[in-house]
Design a protein with these regions (language model features):
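Substrate-binding groove of N-acetylhexosamine-processing glycoside hydrolases
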Residues: 1-158
Length: 159
């Protein structure tokens, strides 16, 4: 992001491509032993969706120079069209939503719910999307000594 911020401050048009958000050749899941070979890194759908391409550190005039964001999929490890689709989808849907949704209107929960519809379109089209979005995610609260219990919440797509 630093390079894009500097360019905007110098009044250059900027397309943001921060690798930790939009490099789609990174693994889309932590379960890499079942994944096709990738360059490394970890970039799940939720991380792509969390991108805010217009950094808050810029003033209003500087923000005008941020004209968008771009996803990158370097293909040195991509061996087929099916693998290319797998690495792109549904992360490309998340990046699209980042681009056309105002930050105040973004909602990860709403986007997760819309993924069910998007996936039905992928199925009709016969494209190979990443099924890792169905993995079960666990969240937990660390208890205080007085509580003596741990609350674990399990969720998956649309739940």
């Amino acid at each position: 992001m630093d390079g894009g911020i500097e360019a905007a401050r110098l009044k250059h048009p900027v397309i943001m491509t921060p690798n930790n958000y939009v490099y789609l050749d990174y693994y889309p899941t932590m379960n890499t032993q079942d994944e096709p070979l990738a360059i490394g890194g970890y970039n799940p759908v939720e991380k792509v969706y969390s991108l805010e391409p217009v950094p808050a550190v810029l003033n209003e005039q500087e923000r005008a120079y941020i004209i968008g964001a771009q996803g990158n999929l370097w293909t040195e490890y991509i061996l087929s069209n099916e693998q290319l689709e797998y690495m792109l989808l549904p992360r490309l849907a998340a990046l699209s939503e980042v681009q056309w949704t105002q930050p105040a209107n973004k909602s990860w929960e709403r986007f997760q719910n819309s993924l069910s519809h998007i996936i039905s379109i992928y199925n009709v089209m016969g494209v190979n999307y990443g099924k890792h979005i169905y993995e079960i995610a666990a969240k937990y609260d660390v208890p205080t000594a007085s509580e003596g219990k741990v609350v674990v919440t399990l969720s998956t797509l649309g739940d």
